[in-house]
A protein has these predicted regions:
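Short pre-catalytic strand/loop immediately N-terminal to key active-site residues, enriched for Gly-Thr
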Residues: 14-25, 166-168
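Glycine-rich beta-strand-to-loop/alpha-helix junction loops that act as flexible
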Residues: 28-29, 171-175
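Short, well-structured alpha-helical segments that form the helix of a local strand-helix-strand
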Residues: 49-60, 188-191
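Short hydrophobic/aromatic beta-strand micro-patches
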Residues: 178-180
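Single conserved hydrophobic/aromatic residue that forms the stacking wall/gate
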Residues: 1-12
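DPxDG-like acidic metal-binding loop motif
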Residues: 24-50, 66
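Conserved, helical-rich catalytic subdomain that frames metal- and/or nucleotide-binding sites
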Residues: 69, 74-167, 182-195, 202-214
Length: 214
């Protein structure tokens, strides 16, 4: 781990304030692990590089390397092979139904589909590279949403699109759903109209996955 990488073997206690819901497909556990690694590196002044932190992080979870670095990235392999992409100029509204989806079960169901639909990654990357938000939104697709086939997910997608989202998809393995909006003002307006969800937030793309707050 981060301590062992610099010969530090002390036992420590930490407290993590978790703001992301569980079984939402938002990488909450991975974000906690990434924050802990960043904090250890800072506290013990081990000065590990992002590459070193990511090599530790991937052993904890496939999404941890992305949470360590953040930004907009193309993730390949199990998630540890990352390429930088320009962040689109947009905003998101995220809502979560009162149901959770087990990640292992989501992948198991996906694996049972003989010929699942997939997005055209080359086309999507071209629109991301050109900053074409409408092109990005028209080519978004989540194969796990296709596999989940849950009424609650479909309802959340409908509600977001009905509130003005350019596109709406399930996040990761679910069950949260995000809607894409052209700016923060339209996202906030839409969020104010959405009610009855166990979790709701408005956010924007950022260049990094962490921030120290003193």
């Amino acid at each position: 781990d981060a301590q062992e990488s610099r010969g530090l073997g002390d036992v420590y206690k930490r407290q993590v304030e978790k703001n992301l819901p569980s079984q939402a497909g938002m990488g909450g556990g991975s974000a906690d692990a990434a924050a802990t690694l960043r904090a250890l590196d800072f506290i013990f002044d081990t000065r590990l590089t992002d590459e070193q932190l990511c090599s530790i992080g991937v052993a904890l979870g496939a999404d941890v390397p992305f949470c360590i670095t953040g930004g907009t990235r193309l993730c390949q392999g199990v998630g540890e092979i990352m390429s930088n992409l320009p962040s689109p100029d947009c905003a998101f509204v995220i809502i979560k139904p009162d149901v959770g989806i087990s990640t292992p079960e989501a992948f198991k169901k996906y694996d049972s589909i003989s010929n699942p639909k997939r997005c055209n990654m080359d086309v999507l990357l071209r629109y991301i590279g050109g900053g074409k938000l409408f092109g990005i939104c028209s080519n978004l697709f989540n194969v796990l949403e296709y596999a989940a086939d849950r009424e609650e997910i479909a309802h959340a997608v409908h509600e977001l699109k009905n509130s003005g989202a350019l596109s709406a998809l399930m996040t990761g393995s679910g069950s949260a759903v995000f809607g894409v909006f052209p700016d923060i003002a339209s996202a906030q307006t839409a969020a104010e109209k959405l009610s009855g969800w166990s979790y709701k937030c408005v956010c924007q793309p950022v260049k990094q996955g962490w921030e120290f707050v003193y």
